[in-house]
Each structure stands twice: as C-alpha cells, then as structure tokens.
Amino acid sequence: MKLIESRQLAKLPWLMHAFSTRGGGVSRVYGGNALNLGFTKHDFRGAVERNRVLFLKTLDVVSGRKSWPLITLRQIHSDLIHCVDRPSEKLLVGDGLITNTPGLLIAVQAADCLPVIVVDRKRRAIGVFHAGWRGTAKRIVEKGVGEMRKHFGSDPRNMLAAIGPGIQSCCYEVGGEVRTKFESQFAYAASLFRELKESDPVREKYPLLFLTARAPGHSELPVKMFLDLVEANRRQLLDTGLAEKSIDASAPCTSCNRDILFSFRGDKGVTGRLLGVAGIRPN
C-alpha cells in the first residue's frame, strides 16, 4: 500500500498524516484490489470497512485490537467546519474538521476535490478540509484557518499546509457559471482560469477561408475553460497569513494519474475515494 506524505509535514514528529492512493485494498470494483475508503454505491460496505482497517494498520495507529478513532464527514461541498475532541455518535455533516486532541484521526474523502491538511506546529492543532470548486468559492480553507485561530489561538505564521492529490488545471474543465462565481468572490479570479479554443481541422487546413468576417449565424470557435483549484486554495492560505514556503502544493493530479489515484472525472463518475488524514500522536 502506497501513501503520499508531505515532506514538510513529515518533519513534525508529533504529527501523523497521509493521503491514501488507489491500490493495496480488497475492493473488487474500480479495477480490483482497490483501496476505496469511501462508502460509495458501487462498492460493498464490508470491503470498505476492511480497506479502512488495512489503511489504519499501514498508518501504524493500531495496537492490538485498539486503533485511533477515525472521524469522517458526510460531505456536502459546504463551508461547515466542526471542532472535535471525541468521535460523534452520528456522522457529522460538513467539509472540515479541526482538533487539538491527541489520538484522534480526522479525515476528508476526495476523488478530484482537494484534501487539504493544515497544522499549527506551535500549539499542536490540526485541520483537514475538503475543497472542491464550491467549497473553495465559499472559502472553506480560509475559514478553516479562522476556526483554528478562534478555538486554539493559532497564529498563521506558525502554520503549515499540505494540499493533497486533486484535479489540476491541466484537466479541470469548468463552465462559465464557475468563473462567474469565483469572479464574485476573488479579485484575483482571472488568474485562476485558463482558456483554450477547441481545434477545428477545417480551419487549420484552410485558414485563408476564415480571414474574412464570419457569416451571419456562425459563431467563434467554442472556448474551453480550466480552473486552477490548487492555486485558488494556495492563495486563500496566503491571504490568511501563511508564508509561501509553509504551503506544500506538490501532490499529483488525480486525473493524470488514474493508475494510482481515484478521479471522479477521469473515471467518468465510477470511482472510489481516497482519504486525507491527520492526527496528533499522544505523548
């Protein structure tokens, strides 16, 4: 089983963190031997539960029959963030978790959306956030840092962040409504989008035919638009006060690396979920 870690976060001896990958599990769907860690409609619940046990053992948070509690969410692409100090009897609804309690694993699921881990290295507090385009537009990560400041007295100057595997600007095509939403929220929104005109073999072969004004009823070539979700979240972290060198955004693109990662878009909606997890080691 392969895990992805942030080199920067790995330097903190009291911190446990990881982003899971696609292989090394028992799920027969999603290509087989899949480490699907989300209760998706295509997989058996028992397989997911077994995958989670294998994952926790790999993280070395299992001792005998006891393991660290794993706290997850029913994610709804929101800006709802929960501060937890123990497992909840009911599945919490939202897209962010924060804690300063040792011996708990907090986690978010993803399969193109970004799993983001934020760590206060001085006060030993942590947060995990699920940032798709909707959550990013709602400033989930920015608000998460704010919640850590409120609950734990965290100072962004003492914080580190790791943006985990997610779909990147090379592959993340979006519609005009997404750009409109971002432009209503961020002054720098234009820098987050890349436009690409679709190719037209006829135009490319006979360019002189298209030098004159286009005939009535004929439109310009359609434009594809791509969003840099990683940069959008990196900018939010910078705006909260984190130093540029404190943000690790080196994780791979899920859509480009479907052999090792789950991608909702790349797998056409039939895929598993990875986890971004963090925990504080007990003294």
Regions found by a protein language model. Name each.
Residues 1-283:
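Active-site microenvironment for binding and transforming phosphate-containing groups
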